[in-house]
Design a protein with these regions (language model features):
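Bacterial N-terminal signal peptides that target proteins for export
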Residues: 2-16
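Intrinsically disordered, low-complexity regulatory segments
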Residues: 5, 27-28
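Polybasic/polar functional segments that serve as interface/processing modules
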Residues: 18-21
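N-terminal signal peptide c-region/cleavage motif recognized by signal peptidases
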Residues: 23-25
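Acidic, Ser/Thr/Pro-rich low-complexity intrinsically disordered segments
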Residues: 29-33, 73-144
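C-terminal edge strands of extracellular/lumenal beta-sandwich accessory domains
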Residues: 29-69, 81-85, 130-154
Length: 154
């Protein structure tokens, strides 16, 4: 049976695009230190993750300022988020807190619609929509590394 090479090439091209798009969505959901999934009413003390921050990747390259015009500061190990925070439903208010045993830290959070929130050791804000949030925990000073615990509260 004779197969048209141009037709085979056309189908291979479509399959390649599907593979690229699928891989992109998988990579978009990766994190250096894991994921946290939350629904309203979660138990206090259950939304905790650990990691290690610091490096030479400038967090202002993600966003210079957040939705409230606050500066986004700090340095992380790389451009991959440290954590993925998945909100199963909308939250009227959330607070993210970093305990790094005294090392000055920063937070950058990019939401599902591209909305950015920034803070220092803690970040409290309103109107958190359901979806995936990329969370970077940074060191205030370039090259400084520190272990930390990240907690989320309503």
């Amino acid at each position: 049976m004779f197969l048209n090479p141009m037709r085979q090439f056309k189908h291979a091209k479509y399959l390649a695009w599907i593979a690229v798009l699928s891989a992109t969505s998988v990579f978009a959901q990766t994190a250096n230190f894991g994921k946290i999934s939350l629904a309203p009413g979660f138990e206090p003390g259950t939304a905790i993750a650990t990691g290690s921050t610091g490096g030479y990747f400038s967090l202002p390259s993600i966003a210079n300022r957040d939705r409230h015009n606050n500066f986004c500061l700090g340095y992380s190990g790389n451009q991959t988020p440290d954590h993925i925070l998945t909100l199963e439903r909308d939250f009227p208010k959330l607070r993210l807190q970093v305990d790094s045993r005294g090392t000055p830290t920063t937070l950058v959070v990019r939401g599902p619609s591209g909305t950015v929130r920034c803070g220092n050791t803690s970040l409290e804000d309103t109107d958190w929509k359901a979806g995936n949030y990329s969370v970077w925990v940074g060191a205030k000073n370039e090259g400084v590394q520190s272990d930390y615990t990240l907690s989320v509260r309503e």
